[in-house]
Amino acid sequence: EALAARLAAVVPRAEDDPEAQLAPFANPDVARRISAMIDRDLEVPGAEDVTARHRPGPRVVEWEGSTYLLPTVVRCDSPEHPLANREFLFPFAAVVEVPAETMPAVLGPTLAVTVLTADEGLRRRILASPHLQRLNLGPLPTWQVSWDQPHEGNLFEHLYLRRALQGLSGAA
């Protein structure tokens, strides 16, 4: 609820505004189709757009000739809901309460995960998962990037395995 209230306050601003947090869609129809897709999936029982309670208007907005999708937080009752494991081209989060023992398998493949826990066992399981492209341990913003992250362009590290190798001469 608190996250939804906070994100509902994010609105379009001028691109040179230091407080700007949203990017406009180059093609307004893409924004409308994404919003319509979310609305269709919200018709499936077990999910609610929590930000809608805090937002003064619709998810799609026109501002100064550009089209924006406002941040959206959806709460799902189950990881099987169609919106529970979706990623979109705008600030979107699906919140699903699940037992820690089901993590990270319940996540499935994903581009970015932020882990906020002191449970070392859970952190180790999530670190071992091959399905997570980007993993933030702690409250790091997902937009904070580093050049040496494979997802951000350092393909050498991503494509080639570094390995220390030692051996004795003549050893088989």
Q: Which functions belong to the PLM regions below?
A:
Residues 12-21, 46-53, 113-118, 136-140:
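Flexible, glycine/charged-enriched surface loops at secondary-structure junctions
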Residues 16-17, 29, 39-41, 49, ...:
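Acidic-enriched, low-complexity/disordered segments with a strong bias for Aspartate over Glutamate
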Residues 1-15, 38, 42-45, 130-134, ...:
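Structural signal for hydrophobic packing residues in well-ordered secondary-structure cores
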